[in-house]
Amino acid sequence: MMENFKHTTVLLDEAVNGLNIRPDGIYIDGTFGRGGHSRLILSQLGEEGRLLAIDRDPQAIAVAQAISDPRFSIIHGPFSALADYVAERELTGKIDGILLDLGVSSPQLDDAERGFSFMRDGPLDMRMDPTRGQSAAEWLQTAEEADIAWVLKTFGEERFAKRIARAIVERNREQPMTRTKELAEVVAAATPVKDKFKHPATRTFQAVRIWVNSELEEIEQALKSSLSVLAPGGRLSIISFHSLEDRIVKRFMREQSRGPQVPAGLPMTEAQLKKLGGRELRALGKLMPGEKEVAENPRARSSVLRIAERTNA
């Protein structure tokens, strides 16, 4: 039985407003979660509107399946494959907006059995979809020390990555870790300098989670796919929660807003320039949560919403 863990949707109104909803439009919520954004989108759609929601978490799928609305459909899978889902429905180039709320959700963090949190002891899993792929425990038991260190440094920006990786490998040789508490204790013991404002396992848990779920690759693929999926004037509305996610989104929107970069002085005909194409997106700026939202939901503090619009190029 699935427990009802509370989830407060971050930047709810702002993210949906960023889609510039048309009553008869077709929209994608690529991260259904507990349905906060989807329900608000549906409330703004008319009878002809459609909403396609995606999530790879079986618990989110169970929540979505309880929505009995003919305008709504749910897909169990990664949002990186959104171009395939759209093509299967013959909607390529017809999508009016895509919303992505990146990272781990509050219900996933709060449910000890999911293994995302160092604050609650549970199985060392961390998979967004527990039915697919390697768990965190399985990966840490089989990975090379150098690979673990690279993951901690790259995806957790952990300055003690090598020390922690060595401690993880040594501990797994003695007794394989299967619990979140075990990993948190190993990391804490291997960290020589503690940050009084942050648990020593914070960066390690973030890095392992990102690696196990291929989160950054998922984001990059979804962003690339959005260009073929969106109709001219269609919107991208994306919420990020840490610098690694936001960096990818920011870079993508900036590059697609600039168009092809041709070196100065390179001789090109008008036909060649036209073939290169123009700007794919128009960046519409970013928003951050206000003081009131952060006070009511501290997890919103690090969130950033970026919005862009598909051009006619």
UniProtKB/Swiss-Prot annotation:
Function in brief: Specifically methylates the N4 position of cytidine in position 1402 (C1402) of 16S rRNA.
Positions of S-adenosyl-L-methionine binding: G35, G36, H37, D55, F79, D101, Q108
Catalysis performed (reactions): cytidine(1402) in 16S rRNA + S-adenosyl-L-methionine = N(4)-methylcytidine(1402) in 16S rRNA + S-adenosyl-L-homocysteine + H(+)
Coarse class of the protein's main subcellular location: cytoplasm
Transmembrane segments: none
UniProt similarity note: Belongs to the methyltransferase superfamily. RsmH family.
E.C. designation(s): 2.1.1.199
Keyword Cytoplasm in annotation: yes
Annotated GO MF terms: rRNA (cytosine-N4-)-methyltransferase activity
First and last residue of the signal peptide: none
Keywords: Cytoplasm, Methyltransferase, rRNA processing, S-adenosyl-L-methionine, Transferase
BP-aspect Gene Ontology terms: rRNA base methylation
Alphabetized SUPFAM superfamilies for the sequence: Putative methyltransferase TM0872, insert domain, S-adenosyl-L-methionine-dependent methyltransferases
Name of the coding gene: rsmH
Keyword Ubl conjugation: no
Cellular component GO terms, alphabetical: cytoplasm
Subcellular location: Cytoplasm
Name of the protein described by the UniProt record: Ribosomal RNA small subunit methyltransferase H
